[in-house]
């Protein structure tokens, strides 16, 4: 049997056992109050290891809907020949201006282990402030239909002071 485990910071936990010769279709993973949960993890967890991933997959799936993950929506680990069909990723929109920092800043997309190929599209940011971040806004992957408006930032203690 294969176990599918959902666990969100000790508030939600579910385990599903699936016979090894059966396929799993139609999983929906959603967080009940996405803004509250996302903001909690964004403000209180400084490293990525403390934020939950909506679902981690170690075998093939189809017809997945993933909603409002505080970190990654989908992670593939220790897989060969993974095939994903009919995936939908839904997310909420933060209505208020975003303040980010201190830290790395905001990264759109991730190259992943071994610089695997990744593409990101349809990201629109309007109104963000970056305080004491190393990078501000950045992307390490191919992006399409991405806009940043009204984004600004400053350092209270510059990381790389000007040369004298």
From Swiss-Prot:
Its EC number is 3.2.1.15. Disulfide bonds: none annotated. GO terms for molecular function: polygalacturonase activity. The keyword Cell wall biogenesis/degradation applies. It is found in: Secreted, Cell wall. Belongs to the glycosyl hydrolase 28 family. Its main location: secreted. InterPro entries: Glyco_hydro_28, Pectin_lyas_fold, Pectin_lyase_fold/virulence. The keyword Secreted applies. Keywords: Allergen, Cell wall, Cell wall biogenesis/degradation, Glycosidase, Hydrolase, Secreted. This is Polygalacturonase. It comes from Cupressus sempervirens (Italian cypress). One of its GO terms (biological process) is cell wall organization. Pfam families: Glyco_hydro_28.
